[in-house]
């Protein structure tokens, strides 16, 4: 992320390798958070402390974080729930880049995990895009299953959804 103050930041998912695998166990969950560290472009390396800034929602397995800034808020978008039919796009925000981040009141910006008959399924990942005329869109991955079956023969496809901001900044 390239902040408007000139600083640059690296975000990544932290994986708990003590865990027995995807989904983990209550004692040692596989997912251990989204971490943030500053990047020094002159030195060409990460510098300073690594900070765990986002635990995700109870849906779990958060990955693919991106940050963008709007009206003094840092918004983090991430994928949750794996890449199958529980896939979802989660949003959180903070006034400071290193958190704390609060989850969107509805948790998910985009998902069809609870709508098994929706024509677009497996929505997740993605990035916010602002057009030159000030409109916002969220690009994301998804799949279109064949009618009556849960097979998406075209695999993961790209989709785009228009975003409308509320008065509360969500």
State where each predicted segment sits.
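Carbohydrate-active catalytic/glycan-binding domains of CAZyme proteins
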Residues: 1-170
